[in-house]
């Protein structure tokens, strides 16, 4: 598949996902009642179908989740002019948030109902600057290990031509979600 074909496929997938997200509840936080009976993969799949809210940060930073599977989450994004640093390349914080989102959601797909996680460590390597010429990038996060207390994952950020822009790893602390109070 050529770079143009990759980009066309990415754009078509993006339009399809955006249509589902726009038809759903929009950005926000799912209620405990909405997700209590769902495992992490089911939650992510429901979000992609527009049945659950998605994270508001995705709208703010112009990226979205485009694919989920067991132990995998793929995000796609396009930095806007307000995401550039003073020298005209994409700010490292944009990279970090996109990478952390793909990593966290990959880990989330392995959570059983009533279990949660938080990022304990995030290591990022920015290997090539993203300039305004880059139309889209994709972050594909994959779980390396998922245990009772810790999970680890890795992610690569690439362009449609396969150019590697960054890679990262995470260690997440896994825990039981607190019971909902009746107050």
Region roles according to the model:
Residues 1-183:
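Terminal targeting signals and extreme-terminal segments of soluble enzymes
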